[in-house]
Swiss-Prot record:
Pfam families: PdxJ. It comes from the Bacteria. The gene is pdxJ. This is Pyridoxine 5'-phosphate synthase. The keyword Amino-acid biosynthesis does not apply. Catalyzes the complicated ring closure reaction between the two acyclic compounds 1-deoxy-D-xylulose-5-phosphate (DXP) and 3-amino-2-oxopropyl phosphate (1-amino-acetone-3-phosphate or AAP) to form pyridoxine 5'-phosphate (PNP) and inorganic phosphate. Pathway: Cofactor biosynthesis; pyridoxine 5'-phosphate biosynthesis; pyridoxine 5'-phosphate from D-erythrose 4-phosphate: step 5/5. It catalyses: 3-amino-2-oxopropyl phosphate + 1-deoxy-D-xylulose 5-phosphate = pyridoxine 5'-phosphate + phosphate + 2 H2O + H(+). It comes from Synechococcus sp. (strain JA-3-3Ab) (Cyanobacteria bacterium Yellowstone A-Prime).
Amino acid sequence: MLSLGVNIDHVATLRQARRTVEPDPVAAAVIAELAGADGITVHLREDRRHIQERDVRLLRQTVRTHLNLEMAATDEMVAIALEIKPDYVTLVPERREEVTTEGGLDVAGQVSRLSEVVSQLQGSGIPVSLFVDPDPIQIAAAAQVGARWVELHTGRYAEASSEAQQEAELAQLRQASQQAIQLGLRVNAGHGLTYWNVGPVARIPGMEELNIGHSIISRAVLVGLERAVREMRQAMGLSSGVGPA
C-alpha cells in the first residue's frame, strides 16, 4: 500500500538560518505523524547545513512510524547509522556546493564500495535503499550490491517543461519500477514532487512510499503543517489522515 514519508529537512533549514532552537524538527515530526505521515525522512549531510546529529538521535527516540535516514556512503555516516540504527537508510550522492541532491547515485560506478556499505548496514539490521535515477543500468546495479529498495529520483519528471516531456519521464519511472520489482527490489520515489504533480507518480504500480519535503513545508508556512500533510495525502489519493479534522 502506498505511503507518505515526510521529509522535515527544511524545518531545520529555517532553524539554522538564525542558529537558534526553533522551529524544532522533532516537534514537526510529531505533528506530521499525527496528521497521517507514514514515515519521517531526514538527510544528515556531511556539512550539517540543516539536520544535526542531535536531531537524528532525538528522532530515533520519538518517531513512532519509521525513520528514514538519508546519507552519503562515507565511513563517518555509516558509523553514525550503525550507532543510531534508523529503521532504514537511503544512500544518496552528495556534493557540498549543491543546494539540494541533484541526481541519483552512480551505483554502477562504485559497485565494490556500495556492496561493502550495504553489507555493513544490513548486517546490523538496517535495511538499505539507494536513491537512483530511473536508469536500467543503475537499477540492475542496485540489485547487484544487495539493496532492499530503490528510491527513484523524480527530479526530471518534476522539472519537465512540457506535458510531452513529463509523460516521457513518467514512462521511464514506470519502466524503472517494473524492472526493480522484477529484480526483487522494493520501490520508493521522491524529489521535486508537489501537490500538483504527485498524482501520476502515486499511481505507478508497485510504488510503496513517496518521500516529500519542500512542497509540504512550503505549504505549511501558509496553512500549518497538519493541514499541509493531510492535503498531500489527499493529492496522493490516500485518506486525509488519522487525527481530528
